[in-house]
């Protein structure tokens, strides 16, 4: 049985301009498990390694500093090094429902809302200054969230989120226009 990368890209992220002139890329995903299970996929370093676009060890305390290092795949594909590390800070945390942090000048907000059916809604928002960030960020987060969804549902992932992001990139180009 093959577990190919998802082919449906009908759940594209939406881009809006914020009141302060920045841009917010927002995704919603219904996850088949409760927030406690999704929280593990968001915060466990081993699970993050499969989908998050950096190596990061969370210190889940408000104000904690974060370091985002290139992944092994980014080092291989794009020649990134330790010199390409970036930094951020935890701004809000309420396990297992809310994680917000900065990553350089960007803000990433992960909200998990449980429902009565034992599932949860993930609302992810990436806020940034440059509209040109929307296309590559949108394709990358879309692909990463597909891996996160599979992890939460205990489905195997035998596709590359990097390849998947490349396949989605044309769908996201319109966001940067």
Regions found by a protein language model. Give the residues of each.
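Hydrophobic ligand-binding cavity/cleft-lining segments
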Residues: 1-57
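Beta-strand/loop substructures that line and gate deep hydrophobic ligand-binding cavities in soluble
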Residues: 3, 98-150
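Intrinsic-disorder/low-complexity, polar/charged segments enriched in Ser/Thr/Lys/Arg/Asp/Glu/Gln
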Residues: 22-28, 65, 85, 98, ...
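Short beta-edge strand/loop motif at the mouth of beta-sheet-based domains
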Residues: 26-27, 45-83, 160-167
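Hydrophobic/aromatic beta-strand elements that line small-molecule binding cavities or substrate pockets
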Residues: 29, 55-56, 86-92, 107-114
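A short, structured loop/turn motif at beta-sheet edges
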Residues: 35-36, 60-61, 91-96, 112-121
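Hydrophobic pocket/interface hotspot
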Residues: 38-39, 48, 66, 90, ...
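Short, highly charged C-terminal tails/helix-capping segments
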Residues: 152-177
